[in-house]
Design a protein with these regions (language model features):
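Structural signature of multi-pass alpha-helical membrane transport proteins
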Residues: 1-36, 40-56, 77, 160-230, ...
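Transmembrane alpha-helix boundary signature
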Residues: 29-30, 50-64, 79-92, 257, ...
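Cytoplasmic-side transmembrane-helix entry/capping segments in multi-pass membrane proteins
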Residues: 33-45, 65-69, 90-101, 123-128, ...
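Membrane-embedded alpha-helical segments of transport systems
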Residues: 104-107, 123-142, 251, 279-280, ...
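Membrane-interface helix termini and inter-helical loops of multi-pass transporters
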Residues: 54-63, 142-157, 199-208, 232-233, ...
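Alpha-helical transmembrane segments and their cytosolic membrane-interface
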Residues: 116-164
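Juxtamembrane and boundary regions of transmembrane helices in multi-pass small-molecule transporters
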Residues: 80-91, 133-151, 168, 174, ...
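Alpha-helical membrane segments and immediately flanking helix-loop junctions
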Residues: 88-128, 267-299
Length: 320
């Protein structure tokens, strides 16, 4: 609340995340986001799913080169980040690979566990990466939009639509967990909402109070990821991940620029779509800016699918 009152872009999300980082550095407990976190991310997923149109799926069919660019970006970003973390920062090889890949936090932690790496280090690295990316996005908004999100007005929400929205989120959360979807709290409601959009032409959306709830939920969920981290771990993690992101910026911008040309979508959309981490966070920023959040999520999901399918095969240290 203080961050929003002070005029900080993304204040409702960055504020809780910063408090969590501070509490962890001071060795204080951080409460879990609990059901609120799932519901907040579910509201975002349902809203994005309601914006999905056939063109977002056809783009993957009509532009097969998009798959090559995305795959190339994933491997190149992972390889460059892996070199930085293992050669410069002294990370263990397996952990460095999964910490460097631009995939979902939960998925990367699970892959690290399966590979016998240090899952805790990977979790902290991805949490810090998302925090730094959000801070960078807030600075960019403050610079380009003078701290305002006025470029996109959220529509009012009728009572019937609100009831349907909450029903979709509930069903999506249950179904997503049951069938073990990646990032189930986002993807479950997103798929149910997208189905309603395609079949019944019923496009669900959120209003400003619900977006604030989503920001709070995502921010506190990120804050909870810092639980158990010491000040030295956070300090060293910040400079290591900052250095890695600086190494990835040229690849990030190049991939976004190439896909912008292939798809004729704006550069802002592609920068959010190819941001090296933070699917829910980047989708929320896209929603607030009116920058095609459905397409942003589509490309993030494509990236996660590629990583889950090929991460172990692409691991550059397997023959070492």
């Amino acid at each position: 609340m203080l961050a929003d009152w002070a005029g900080v872009p993304l204040g409702w999300m960055l504020g809780p995340a910063f408090v969590g980082l501070l509490l962890a550095a001071l060795n204080n407990p951080i409460g879990s986001d609990g059901p609120l976190g799932n519901w907040g991310r579910g509201l975002l997923g349902a809203s994005v799913g309601g914006m999905l149109q056939s063109e977002h799926l056809l783009i993957l069919i009509n532009a097969p080169e998009l798959l090559l660019v995305t795959g190339g970006y994933v491997f190149a970003a992972g390889f460059v980040g892996w070199l930085w973390l293992t050669r410069v920062c002294g990370w263990q090889s397996q952990s460095g690979w999964y910490a460097a890949l631009p995939g979902g936090l939960s998925e990367m932690v699970e892959l690290t566990r399966q590979a016998g790496g240090r899952a805790y280090e990977v979790a902290l690295a991805h949490a810090l990466r998302i925090f730094l990316l959000l801070s960078l996005a807030a600075l960019a908004v403050a610079f380009v939009h003078e701290g305002s999100w006025s470029g996109f007005a959220l529509p009012p929400l009728a009572l019937s639509d609100a009831l349907m929205l909450f029903a979709v989120v509930w069903v999506g959360l249950v179904l997503g967990k049951r069938i073990r979807l990646p990032a189930h709290s986002v993807m479950g409601p997103l798929l149910i909402s997208a189905l309603l959009s395609f079949v019944l032409d019923w496009h669900l959306s959120v209003n400003e109070p619900l977006v604030i709830v989503a920001q709070l939920a995502i921010g506190w969920s990120l804050a909870h990821r810092f639980q158990g981290s010491s000040f030295p771990q956070i300090r060293s993690g910040l400079w290591q991940i900052t250095g890695m992101l600086l190494c990835l910026i040229p690849l990030w911008v190049l991939a976004a620029w190439v896909v912008m040309i292939l798809t004729e979508h704006g550069l802002a959309v592609m920068l959010l779509a190819f941001a090296p981490g933070g699917q829910a966070e980047m989708a929320l920023i896209a929603l607030l800016l009116g920058a095609s959040p459905a397409l942003v999520v589509t490309l993030h999901v494509l990236r996660v699918v590629l990583i889950l399918s090929f991460a172990s095969r692409w691991y550059p240290g397997k023959n070492r």
